[in-house]
Every structure is written in structure tokens, then in C-alpha cells.
A protein has these predicted regions:
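Exposed alpha-helical structural elements
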Residues: 78, 101, 116, 256-257, ...
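Noncatalytic linker/hinge segments flanking ATPase motor cores
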Residues: 13, 75-81, 140, 180-181, ...
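Non-catalytic terminal extensions that flank enzyme cores
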Residues: 1-9, 29, 34, 129-131, ...
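Active-site cores that bind ATP or allylic diphosphates and position pyrophosphate for catalysis
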Residues: 100-237, 244-248, 297-307
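N-terminal Rossmann-like or analogous alpha/beta NTP/dinucleotide-binding catalytic cores
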Residues: 1-110, 199-200, 204-217, 274
Length: 307
């Protein structure tokens, strides 16, 4: 069981499409099923209109799915029950540190690029907590253990949680449950056995595997695919409109776009137009590049331009 898990914060860009294509091809090449899950945890940036557009864009590309999980914004009771399980085990504590205090600490960075938490609030007494006036976020105590796993693209990985992850937030100060908790609950309860996502999320994997073990769930197999970068080395973002789905759909057919992505993925030697379904028999993880993939400056040359 695989999954698409897009965030409805804008139109998909080329990197999102590339990852979605590989996730779909991997599952379909094994005769597996695909779930769609809308990750709308961020209430400030998520829009229902974007979620509907994501569905249309995936369908336009020929990437179908077999079922859809309820959006994350509707699943707070599920996350609350898992939060309570952590609390019952004494793994949760309130953190009153502001964002500026965390950054002013000049602490080393965690494996996901965030500031490694210093543990300032880890052992506060009940009296010290009662004296705080700020609404707390909630962190989980991580053990000083090594978590090892084999990524399907990046190979063997080992992280020592206390050194590369630190106590991480599972519920924000505004009450919203954090991504790390939500994604583990949803993957486990959705029966997901294979997670394909960008290599920028590799640093989140060890802590998620640890949460799977704490909750007693089997963990999925992970594949962290290379990022697509602009010719000047910049990472793509949804703010760059020239390579998002709105611009691409106005300039090309689904087969043209899939063909160019298949070439970048090593699934065909040239950019010939092809349907996603026709790539299933060619798919192999052995063919996927291991490092960042630079999008050629002439990537869209030859696309059919619609009047």
C-alpha cells in the first residue's frame, strides 16, 4: 500500500509531480494499492480549493488512487488518542520556549534542519511550570538510542536520536498536532507499507520509526527520492510559478510532461511522450538516480503550446 500525501497550500511543482509519479509507479509495478491523503495540518495556508485542484492534477497526469483517507484537519481525535498514549508512558512534557529563545540558544541543528532542542523545559518542577504564562507546546522525550534502517534509495542510515533529533514537538502551542505525530498515525492506520517522498524528509525518518515502535505499529519501507533543482541549484518551491502545474498544464500534454520526468528518472533515454501507465513495466528503483537532479534549462522546449 502506497500513498500520495500532498499539502493543499498551492499547486504542485515539478518536484512534487516527480515524487508522485515514482510513488505511483513503484506501487503499481508491484500490483499494490494507492491511497490519497490530504495533509492540511497548517490551517493558515491550507485551502479546500487547492485540495480539489491536487486531485484534478493527479488525475490529469494519469495517476489514480484506490481510496482516500479523511483530511488530517478532521483527524484530531485520532491524534489526541495517540498523544494520550505517549502521555501515559511519561514521554510528554510542556515546552514554554519561544521561537526566538530557541534560535538565540545557538544550538546545533537537528537532522531535519530545525534547531536541536536544548532540553530547557524537560525537567521543570510543577512549581516552575505553574509560574509560566506562555501557552506551551508539547514535546516527546526521545531516548539516547540509535535507530537504523535501510532506505530504498539512500541505503543504510543510522541516527542517534538524542544527538540528531532531540526532543521534538508533537503538539504545537496553538493546539494543532504536529506533522511527525500525524504522519505516523495516518500511515499506520491507513495500512501504508511503502512511503515514497523527497530526500529533504530523510531526516524525519528515524524519529518516525521510533514513534511507530512506541505505538506498536509495523513501520513502512521508505524511499527518499532525489530532489529536482533549478539549473542554478535552487530548490523548487510552490512560489515559483513557471514550473507549477498551472503553467505546465497550459503548455503541454500529460504524456509530454510524464515523458520528460521519466527521462530525468532514468526510465527512458529520451524525452519521448509516454503515458504513466506505460511506464509501469519499466519501473525499477535501481534505475533512479541517487543524487540531486538538475532540471535542464531547456526542459520545456518542444512542449505543445496551446492557443
Amino acid at each position: 500500500m502506497g500513498r500520495f500525501a500532498p499539502s493543499p497550500t498551492g499547486r504542485m511543482h515539478l518536484g512534487n509531480i516527480f515524487t508522485a509519479l515514482l510513488a505511483w509507479l513503484s506501487v503499481r509495478s508491484q500490483g499494490g494499492s494507492m491511497l490519497l491523503r490530504i495533509e492540511d495540518l497548517d490551517p493558515q495556508r491550507s485551502r479546500a480549493a487547492y485540495a480539489e485542484q491536487l486531485r484534478r492534477d493527479l488525475s490529469w497526469l494519469g495517476l489514480d488512487w484506490d481510496g482516500e483517507m479523511p483530511p488530517q484537519s478532521t483527524r484530531s481525535p485520532v491524534y489526541a488518542s495517540h498523544f494520550a498514549k505517549l502521555e501515559e508512558q511519561g514521554l510528554i512534557y510542556p515546552c514554554y520556549c519561544s521561537r526566538s529563545e530557541l534560535h538565540d540558544a545557538s544550538a546545533p541543528h537537528a537532522s531535519d534542519g530545525t534547531v536541536l532542542y536544548s532540553g530547557a523545559c524537560r525537567d521543570l518542577t510543577p512549581e516552575q511550570r505553574a509560574a509560566k504564562t506562555r501557552r506551551p507546546a508539547w514535546r516527546v522525550r526521545v531516548p539516547d538510542i540509535a535507530v537504523s534502517f535501510r532506505d530504498g534509495v539512500c541505503g543504510p542510515q543510522t541516527e542517534r536520536l538524542a544527538e540528531t533529533c532531540g526532543d521534538f514537538i508533537v503538539r504545537r502551542s496553538d493546539g494543532v498536532y504536529a506533522y511527525q505525530l500525524a504522519v505516523v498515525c495516518d500511515d499506520a492506520l491507513g495500512g501504508v507499507t511503502e512511503v515514497v517522498r523527497g530526500s529533504d524528509l530523510l531526516g524525519s525518518t528515524a524519529r518516525q520509526l521510533w514513534l511507530f515502535s512506541v505505538f506498536g505499529y509495523p513501520a513502512p519501507q521508505y524511499y527518499h527520492v532525489p530532489l529536482l533543482v533549478a539549473p542554478d541549484g535552487r530548490r523548487l518551491s510552490k512560489r515559483e510559478r513557471d514550473l507549477d502545474m498551472e503553467a505546465l498544464r497550459a503548455r503541454c500534454t500529460p504524456e509530454q510532461l510524464v515523458g520528460r520526468l521519466a527521462q530525468l528518472a532514468g526510465l527512458q533515454p529520451g524525452p519521448e511522450p509516454v503515458r504513466a501507465a506505460d511506464l509501469v513495466s519499466r519501473f525499477s528503483w535501481e534505475r533512479i538516480p541517487r543524487g540531486e537532479i538538475v532540471i535542464p534549462a531547456n526542459f520545456s522546449d518542444g512542449f505543445r503550446v496551446f492557443p
